[in-house]
Amino acid sequence: MIITIGGLPGTGTTTTSKLISEKYGLNHVCAGFIFRDMAKERNMTLQEFSSYAETNTEVDNEIDRRQVEAAQSGDLILEGRLAGWILKKSDIKPDLSIWLKADPMVRCIRISERENENVDLALEKMISREASEKKRYKEIYNIEIDDLSIYDIVIESSKWDANGVFNIIEKAIENLKA
């Protein structure tokens, strides 16, 4: 089974992916972790590395390559804002493609708690990062990140806790056509 899950920062994709991975024994591959590791390798902050990635397409190419390679082996949950798009462009059809969304301030509060930052700083970083990513996705892939038409399910994650979001997805997985 191949599942993709995407969403902007703070929507709960990592928490949800881990729950799905544990329940169904799927390998968890996260584009964000790959991106963060690459930033650390270059001794850059996420904002610095996002700016660097805007003019250095090898960053996205490497992340894409790793995602496609992982998906070809099957039995995984692929987490990333473009995971669904990358597989579509590579002619790999996931069994289920999910997008999580949440109110920007809810996301900001979640990020500030996760990163142990004050809310104002988290908001500033979030806005900067998302603008950088949106620009990069359009320029490199001709993808509008706001186009959710490729997803089977879109969930407003601020309405439920992590288990509530997982329960919705669990029902969807259980009811997939064989």
Swiss-Prot record:
The keyword Transferase applies. GO terms for cellular component: cytoplasm. ATP binds at residues 7-15. Pfam families: Cytidylate_kin2. It catalyses: CMP + ATP = CDP + ADP; dCMP + ATP = dCDP + ADP. GO terms for molecular function: ATP binding; CMP kinase activity; dCMP kinase activity. It comes from the Archaea. Its EC number is 2.7.4.25. Keywords: ATP-binding, Cytoplasm, Kinase, Nucleotide-binding, Transferase. It is found in: Cytoplasm. GO terms for biological process: pyrimidine nucleotide metabolic process. It is an enzyme of class 2 (transferase). Belongs to the cytidylate kinase family. Type 2 subfamily. HAMAP family: Cytidyl_kinase_type2 (MF_00239). This is Cytidylate kinase. It comes from Methanococcus maripaludis (strain C7 / ATCC BAA-1331).
